[in-house]
């Protein structure tokens, strides 16, 4: 079946069509909110600031341009992502959190998500205040009264919570991962503007840079498709069981383990962590303290080095691939579930030996996936550092492309799974 026939089938299925239309409707709401600014903005100073700040240019990518407009959702999903990272780190430090997340099933996940929601509020308020203080120092926002400052912080915090809610609505009632899809929507929304900027600033002397960029873009697309689609199939057999006059089991299947089971989440987490020191440095530069201002300038210079940025980016993507997979995929849980259902891996004893086998296989596969994903993520940075062509937008383009391709592949995989499930329901 060719791709356009599959698209026709998708829109013929009422339930699947409604899910996709629901996601598109959420995208529209998100883009409307991204264009509602907070009051008292100096537009000229705002544009000047973002043209000079590389770190905030990358942060603006994640918010879909909402930050460069100082909209009510200018923090994007940053506070929620930060809260999730903190809580997932706590699962590796405190056994109670780990037990809640891994062993209490759906109820434990619900509690975990509730804690993440609660942590989003103070983090959103803190980041909102830091942003307002920074923009006020830069002359983007004029002098404001304490009441207006409090109102603005509450508005920005509510915007962060609102986006978190939209992401959860997509995950629950739509299709795909809500956080990834909202970031994807923000990147796509900025694409026409980026194309317009390229056309307006066209210079024949930059043709080699454009050729190099599109060549790397093609390599990134190919690499991401390979990493997302590659998997290791582990054979699983089910023992025969007799109940009454009927026999159950006695068949073989396989347990698929993706080379990169974490998907695009390591990229999002890595960039969230990587951007944090730059945000703090920009905030400290406006405190008026000479020592803090010098320290902030040093941090900014450090982060703007392409090689340092690339090494840090690679290391964080690599580590978060392992970290997120360890949190979401438990070999012990899978082994216990197989044993309860009468399944076993040929040549491996059920229970603890199976968990150990899955653990070894998973971490060998993850080394390949994490290395490949990290390499693709920093490929534009490597080219900029070795050839000197391109600018920071080159890095942004590579990161955006990586996120977009990964999200589209994950979305398409879930759509195909929904279609196959509908086919089975007919019998």
For each predicted feature, which ranges?
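N-terminal cationic and glycine-rich segments that engage phosphates or anionic surfaces
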Residues: 1-427
């Amino acid at each position: 079946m060719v791709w356009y026939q599959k698209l026709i089938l998708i829109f013929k299925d009422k339930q699947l069509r409604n899910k996709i239309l629901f996601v598109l409707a959420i995208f529209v709401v998100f883009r409307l909110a991204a264009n509602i600014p907070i009051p008292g903005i100096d537009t000229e100073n705002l544009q000047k600031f973002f043209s000079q700040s590389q770190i905030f240019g990358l942060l603006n990518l994640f918010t879909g341009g909402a930050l460069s407009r100082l909209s009510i959702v200018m923090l994007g999903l940053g506070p929620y992502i930060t809260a999730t990272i903190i809580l997932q780190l706590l699962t590796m430090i405190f056994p109670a959190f780990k037990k809640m997340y891994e062993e209490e099933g759906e109820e434990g996940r619900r509690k975990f998500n509730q804690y993440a929601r609660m942590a989003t509020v103070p983090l959103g308020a803190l980041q909102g205040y830091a942003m307002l203080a920074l923009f006020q120092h830069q002359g983007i926002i004029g002098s404001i009264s304490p009441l207006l400052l409090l109102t603005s912080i509450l508005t920005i915090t509510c915007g962060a919570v609102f986006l978190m809610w939209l992401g959860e609505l997509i995950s629950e009632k739509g299709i795909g991962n809500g956080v990834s899809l909202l970031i994807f929507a923000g990147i796509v929304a900025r694409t026409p503007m980026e194309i317009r900027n390229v056309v307006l600033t066209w210079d024949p002397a930059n043709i080699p840079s454009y050729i190099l960029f599109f060549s790397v873009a093609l390599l990134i697309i190919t690499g991401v498709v390979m990493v997302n689609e590659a998997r290791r199939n582990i054979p699983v057999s089910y023992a025969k069981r007799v109940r009454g006059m009927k026999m159950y089991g006695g068949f073989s299947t396989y347990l698929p383990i993706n080379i990169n089971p974490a998907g695009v989440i390591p990229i999002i987490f890595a960039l969230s962590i990587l951007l944090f020191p730059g945000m703090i440095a920009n905030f400290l530069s406006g405190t008026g303290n000479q020592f803090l201002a010098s320290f902030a300038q040093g941090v900014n210079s450090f982060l703007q080095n392409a090689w340092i940025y690339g090494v840090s980016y690679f290391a964080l993507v690599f580590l978060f691939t392992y970290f997120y997979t360890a949190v979401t995929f438990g070999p012990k849980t899978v082994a216990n579930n197989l044993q309860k259902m009468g399944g076993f891996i040929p040549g491996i004893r059920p229970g603890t030996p199976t968990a150990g086998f899955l653990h070894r296989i998973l971490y060998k596969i993850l080394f390949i996936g994490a290395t490949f994903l990290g390499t693709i993520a920093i490929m534009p940075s490597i080219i900029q550092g070795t050839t000197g062509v391109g600018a920071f937008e080159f890095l942004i383009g590579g990161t955006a492309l990586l996120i977009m391709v990964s999200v589209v592949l994950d979305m398409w995989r879930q759509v195909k799974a929904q279609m196959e499930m509908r086919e089975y329901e007919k019998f």
